């Protein structure tokens, strides 16, 4: 179990030393709270989190809402609605019955409880989730570019993009940044950071090789607008 300096964000490592990101942790928590603890409620996640959350919520009949990036938007839901879990890509997660804010230590304890009660390894529990939503990989590139180039990329995104190299856009969203959906459940998000002078490019696909290819193609495309 790993947290950041003030312990509001969480990361995990499995028995082989592989890093388990926040997307997988969110999925594990939903799976545990619903299947094993019979809890209910809405799931609220930020725009940059995995699309697999929607699949898991649909599987369990849970309502889901997507917010702009920033935990304050998730907290608003927690304070006003019956929220089972709220989570963001950076590792901040909150669950029902605790505080309406991120707590990495508490999330770690819940995961350990999950492992202890089932007698299963983290890898085995993740496989349970994969059996429902399918395996996936997620990654992000932070592009340190000039403000002029960054604004140029965002302007091009606003105009509309139909393809990134060989990846044809099926549909797009602009809740917070610009998200592009492709075939085979692949997607890409381009967003200017709200805390650093960078342009972030997020991607999700079936495996790491596919994610790397999508990120490479997207990065080359935006840098040549």
Regions found by a protein language model. Give the residues of each.
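Phosphate-binding and adjacent anionic-ligand microenvironments
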Residues: 36-225
